[in-house]
């Protein structure tokens, strides 16, 4: 039997798809590309925006149209957040949520065997539920591995449906995480990314913490680099920063969630910090890790309900002043099921798109300036995708993308390079 996967959304979703693929393979399935045709089609959905829901439905329709005898599966955040709507999708033979992923295989077998024509198996998240283990030992990119350490979010930001889709915070046991890191190191992975729905919440429910986890992860032989997923500034303490700065294997690149550079807009979003508080945390990171050694990246939403032109200009000025290496800019997407859906003073679509273009232009200018300033510096780069026998793509510890000329080296090695010119997308670099 052959199975095909289609993944929407974040790194956690991508990690979970890989784990599901591994689960299917362990039970006799062969994972194939969509073009090769399959007996089972699985879409792991994202529901952050309505557009994500639409893409999930579109892919299911195409899979069913082109392979009418196949079993189609809709799983993940979309059905979990909107179970009644998802259950009515005719093109989905199996509908499951973001929990109890191990049951997907059993649900699929019921349809394959003719026991059921449709299975809807969406179980509500409960406070006190445990982290669901989904072992993952290999990745398409054999250089960087993503390790999920936490699920769920206890916050209630006005624009976000994720707590509804993912349930409450629940942390994976440190023992399980370290066991996975050892397996990954034995398989040749030297860089790992700790991912989560709410990474700084790790350990809040178990009496541990993120800094402690990083310290112990760094002790795993063979793991040379550790990266962190998204962090909330108000949850990063002075002690966390001090302890993280003492871990040499930790890459000094921090995705510090902002969402808006206007304190007024942050209040409307129900984010629990001001721009002044955000700037203070960013300054502490720069001081602890070194101004030239650290990079900070972030996300920014433009066109949130009630955002005036002045609010937007304040946001753009703050973002430019923070000198982020990379900024993901999103026009606000009105999401049913969130408080902001009903907020007054919705910003017109054309204005949101205009603000998105203006913000993007501003942050790309800063990105280019930072890349040009790095020219001539020495950096450590993990060689990733080979472009030829001597050219590789990769990233510095600060997550600056590079193309490295490295004759005699191979993917998966960490090499010392001299950074060169920025071409608008990557720095040219030469291995020393």
Report each predicted region and the residues it spans.
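Proteins enriched for Cys/Gly/acidic motifs involved in redox and nucleic-acid/cofactor modification
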Residues: 1-202, 239, 244, 250, ...
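Short, surface-exposed connector motifs at secondary-structure boundaries
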Residues: 2, 67-68, 220-227
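Conserved glycine-rich "GG(E/T)P / GGGxP" loop and the immediately following alpha-helix
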Residues: 47-52, 189-220, 232-239, 266, ...
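Conserved strand-turn element in the central/C-terminal portion of the radical SAM core barrel
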Residues: 160-167, 225-234, 260-270, 285, ...
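Radical SAM/AdoMet-radical enzyme domain recognition
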Residues: 186, 211-225, 236-298
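Hydrophobic, well-ordered secondary-structure elements that form the walls
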Residues: 256, 299, 319, 327, ...
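Contiguous mid-protein beta-loop-alpha structural module that forms a pocket-lining wall or clamp
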Residues: 307, 322-324
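Terminal RNA-binding accessory module
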Residues: 342-432
């Amino acid at each position: 039997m052959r199975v095909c996967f289609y993944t929407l959304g974040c790194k956690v979703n991508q990690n979970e798809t890989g784990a599901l693929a591994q689960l299917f393979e362990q039970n006799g399935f062969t994972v194939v590309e969509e073009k090769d045709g399959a007996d089972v089609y699985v879409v792991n959905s994202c529901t952050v925006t309505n557009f994500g829901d639409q893409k999930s439905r579109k892919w299911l329709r195409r899979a069913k149209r082109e392979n009418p005898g196949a079993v189609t599966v809709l799983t993940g955040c979309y059905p979990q957040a909107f179970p009644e709507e998802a259950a009515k999708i005719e093109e989905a033979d199996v509908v499951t949520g973001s929990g109890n992923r191990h049951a997907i295989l059993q649900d699929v077998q019921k349809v394959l065997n003719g026991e059921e024509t449709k299975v809807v198996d969406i179980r509500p998240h409960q406070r006190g539920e445990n982290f669901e283990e989904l072992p993952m030992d290999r990745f398409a990119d054999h250089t960087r591995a993503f390790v999920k350490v936490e699920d769920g979010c206890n916050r209630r930001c006005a624009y976000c449906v994720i707590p509804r889709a993912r349930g409450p915070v629940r942390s994976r046991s440190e023992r399980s995480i370290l066991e996975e890191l050892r397996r990954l190191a034995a398989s040749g992975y030297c860089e790992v990314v700790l991912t989560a729905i709410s990474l700084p919440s790790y350990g809040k429910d178990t009496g541990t913490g993120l800094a402690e986890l990083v310290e112990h992860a760094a002790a795993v032989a063979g793991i040379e680099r550790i990266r962190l997923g998204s962090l909330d500034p108000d949850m990063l303490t002075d002690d966390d920063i001090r302890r993280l700065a003492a871990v040499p294997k930790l890459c000094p690149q921090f995705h510090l969630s902002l969402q808006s550079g206007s304190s007024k807009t942050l209040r409307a979003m129900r984010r629990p910090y001001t721009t002044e508080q955000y700037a203070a945390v960013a300054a502490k990171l720069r001081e602890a890790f070194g101004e030239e050694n650290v990079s900070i990246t972030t996300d920014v939403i433009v066109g949130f309900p009630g955002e005036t032109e002045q609010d937007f200009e304040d946001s753009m000025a703050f973002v430019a002043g923070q000198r982020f290496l990379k900024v993901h800019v999103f026009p606000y997407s009105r999401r049913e099921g969130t408080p902001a859906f009903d907020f007054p003073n919705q910003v017109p679509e054309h204005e949101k798109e205009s603000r998105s273009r203006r913000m993007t232009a501003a942050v790309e200018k800063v990105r280019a300036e930072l890349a040009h300033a790095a020219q001539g510096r020495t950096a450590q780069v993990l060689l990733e995708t080979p472009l030829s026998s001597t050219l590789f793509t990769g990233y510095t510890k600060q997550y600056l993308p590079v193309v490295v000329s490295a004759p005699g080296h191979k993917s998966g090695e960490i090499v010392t390079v001299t950074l060169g010119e920025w071409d608008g997308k990557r720095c040219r670099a030469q291995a020393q």
